[in-house]
Amino acid sequence: MSNQMNTMDITEILKYLPHRYPFLLIDRVLDYTPGESLHAIKNVSINEPFFQGHFPIQPVMPGVLILEAMAQATGLLAFKTMSNDVPPPGVLYYFAGIDNARFRRVVVPGDQIHFEVKMIKERRGIGVFYGEARVDGEVACSAEIMCARREINQ
């Protein structure tokens, strides 16, 4: 068994996710095992545009954006599970649903969020994943996320 880590830098992430600034919320993938799990990070900076209004005096990362980042991590795992190569043109994984979302800790500027997502099952192009967002080892958010594989017209 190899101890080699599968990583993705931002250049590779951009090949898989259609998101761009300011909505690309994954900075790096530290490791992944296709069909099993993925570990990604987001470095949270005071320069994030959402901090201008949420909240100016005491900035807190909106929970919905933590979930969006987790969904982006699940999309990366789904693509890497389907094919280790660059995704085929016109194929996307859409956020399809969420269950049991829980928020346990605020995320503030200067934090580094670690996203751990695990594939639970896949059937007919619908993937079910469990994800946790951690800061300094503490769970900030957890949820079950569903995503759907769809081909789009180009």
Curated annotation (Swiss-Prot):
Alphabetical keyword list: Cytoplasm, Lipid A biosynthesis, Lipid biosynthesis, Lipid metabolism, Lyase
Domain of life: Bacteria
A Gene Ontology BP annotation from the UniProt entry: fatty acid biosynthetic process
InterPro entries: FabA_FabZ, FabZ, HotDog_dom_sf
Signal peptide: none
Gene3D superfamilies: Hotdog Thioesterase
Broad EC category: lyase
Gene Ontology MF term list: (3R)-hydroxyacyl-[acyl-carrier-protein] dehydratase activity
Reactions performed catalytically: a (3R)-hydroxyacyl-[ACP] = a (2E)-enoyl-[ACP] + H2O
Positions annotated as active site in the UniProt record: 54
EC number of this enzyme: 4.2.1.59
GO-annotated cellular components: cytoplasm; membrane
Annotated localization: Cytoplasm
Main location: cytoplasm
Family label: Belongs to the thioester dehydratase family. FabZ subfamily.
Function: Involved in unsaturated fatty acids biosynthesis. Catalyzes the dehydration of short chain beta-hydroxyacyl-ACPs and long chain saturated and unsaturated beta-hydroxyacyl-ACPs.
Protein name according to UniProt: 3-hydroxyacyl-[acyl-carrier-protein] dehydratase FabZ
Organism whose genome encodes this protein: Shewanella sp. (strain W3-18-1)
Gene from which the chain derives: fabZ
